[in-house]
């Protein structure tokens, strides 16, 4: 498994607003940039310690655990 500095998963953000979740991720781990994407959006598969996808539904609600990916 890959190791990245700081917190790497935010299960407590499922069901929250995507924008609020992204701000929380970036506040809790200053090494990452949180990117809000709608479910089904194309995303790269390369692993990066500085990126967290925040996946939301059509209502802007987080639907899966944001984590470094």
Swiss-Prot record:
Q: Which UniProt keywords apply?
A: Acetylation, Disulfide bond, Protease inhibitor, Serine protease inhibitor
Q: Which named protein is this?
A: Proteinase inhibitor
Does this entry carry the keyword Disulfide bond?
yes
The UniProt function text for this chain reads:
In vitro, strong inhibitor of bovine beta-trypsin, weak inhibitor of alpha-chymotrypsin, subtilisin BPN', subtilisin Carlsberg and cathepsin G.
Q: What are its GO biological-process terms? A: response to wounding
Disulfide cross-links: 4-49
Q: Does the keyword Acetylation apply?
A: yes
Show which residues form the site (Reactive bond): 45-46
């Amino acid at each position: 498994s890959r190791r990245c500095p700081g917190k790497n998963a935010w299960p407590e953000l499922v069901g929250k607003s995507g924008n609020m979740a992204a701000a929380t991720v970036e506040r809790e781990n200053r090494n990452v940039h949180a990117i809000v994407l709608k479910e089904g959006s194309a995303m790269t598969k390369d692993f990066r310690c500085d990126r967290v996808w925040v996946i939301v539904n059509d209502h802007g609600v987080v639907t899966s655990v944001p984590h470094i990916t």
